[in-house]
Amino acid sequence: MASHEINQSKVVAERLDVADEKYRKASSDEAFNINDNVTAKIQNPLAHLTKEEVIRDVEAFALENGFQDMTPLLVKGALVAKDPPAFESVEGLTDVEKDGVRNEVLHKWRQPKLLYFTIILCSIGAAVQGWDQTGSNGANLSFPDALGIPIENKFPDGTVNPASERNLWLQGVINAGPYIASAFIGCWCSDPLNNYFGRRGTIFVSAVFCALSPIGSAVSQTWDQLFVTRLLLGLGMGCKGSTIPIFSAENAPASIRGALVMSWQMWTAFGIFLGTCANLAVKDTGAISWRLQFGSASLPALPLLLGVYFCPESPRWYIKKGRYTEAYQSLKKLRNTELQAARDLYYIHAQLSIEASLTNMKTNYVTRFIQLFTIPRVRRATLASFTVMLAQQLCGINIIAFYSSTVFVQAGASVTNALLASWGFGLVNFAFAWPAIWTIDTFGRRSLLLFTFPQMAWTLLAAGLCYLIPSSSSAHLGLVALFVYLFAAFYSPGEGPVPFTYSAEVFPLSHREVGMSWAVATCLFWAAVLSITFPRMLDAMSPTGAFCFYAGLNIVAFCLIFLFVPETKQRTLEELDYIFAIPTRRFVSHQCGTVLPWWFQRYVFRRNVGECPALWSFDGHMDNDKEFIETIRRSSVAPDERRRSVVGKLANKF
């Protein structure tokens, strides 16, 4: 029996060698155009090099950047990056270094404390964003009357309010102020600020605006003053929203990048929840309640302001500036071993050297913006990020986040009960964001979106139809709240975390700041449009019409995502260059001609048609072979029991 297992293992090993030889040959034989990846292959820039070529290139890199004293470490790191499944065969690796690489697969959440501290600070920045949104939610019930712009159709004495329609528009514009300023100014300031001050400096500047502007809103005496302070808040929100997801994405390892970067939405949801708590806490303070509701949003900005400089700067930003020594120091703080830091330093350098082929010369801000639409690889990322950001507004989440108190009052709730119902919405939104930590890197960004959008459509439709129940019925308010909560439960693990995570990772480093600015500006511009129009829409179409309208937009968003949003899970930021080099026409053709028919065969006609054929592969391996590579890698780092199990599976496969 033992002899049979040994012979079987030898056969598997020989076949793995043959497969590996084909893998290397495919990598070296095919030229690659980063703007037109017609072969749909994702390539490791080191895989086609011989060991001697890698060593020679690393030595030249070390000499050029002052790393002569750590050349052996860089060589080991480059050889590990060259062939990740075979890292055990690299000469000179210590047991500690091997354990560090193993744990990337077996214990991917074992990361340095400073990485988690950085993500916590970024999460606080997200909470600021959420709290800023809900301050106006509660204040909507009282600030119009306090500032002389009453929105009711009739005054308490029964006389008609002739300015009601005008004041509804003013209320919408004031609520939209931060999003108008973010979309047209704040987001676009992030590129020059990032260029001169780095990621941390930009976050600091934005935190100053986010700390002071809510205080200005709280002391405003006229609606004009309130509008100006809301515009100033938007400057900080735009810079922060464009920078923090990038900062998280650039610091996180690929295996958990999605889960860490999605903390932006999870903690935005937490900020929304805290904002609803603050609205409830101050509701009985009389005439100043709306001032406290606006002003409380400055509280989470203070720890962000003080803590950001305790985080390491983005190593990719340092590399972009040619500051490799500082990049390595940052990576040492963000990785478990110096080997992993050296490996990532050289691998990022190698990928960015290829990425530099996008632009052969240094470009200014305006040129980079134009290139979002003219360079094919960047244009595809621009389209995908635009789609997911637009979808966040099409789904209708912000009609609840901005106006839930108003919506529940129209459903027959008292002011206190409306604030309590809004608090429940904030709690559900936050609680159901947690599953995305585990699912976003397992099922993927695209899969989560395609599953949750149909669910959001029917829950919004149901919520709207529940307004047709007579208001005297006890079921009226309860069912409206139930379906709004179900809507939030489906939104939170899908369209909630994905847009900012996705947009932060899809652009090449050369265009990452301006690309993220574009994505966030898209999101906030349409949030402004929604905020301005919804009060009037609610008045003209009734809650039933407004909710049904947004239910239909969910279906539109589903179709756009299906056609234009590729999957990005578990790829390094640099490997995404190859995914977005696939022509849009080919991607759409694959979705319509392959994926859609497969889905109908599998789930409608219930036929056993196997796995859906993949569009891209990794260096010559088709999708099933990608699983095969991961199986080999896991077998090289797993305990003996798992290794024997994997060898048996591979033997059966061959």
Spans of model-derived segments:
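Alpha-helical transmembrane bundle of multi-pass membrane proteins
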Residues: 2-332, 353-654
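Short intracellular "coupling" helices and adjacent cytoplasmic loop segments at the cytosolic face
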Residues: 334-344, 350, 357
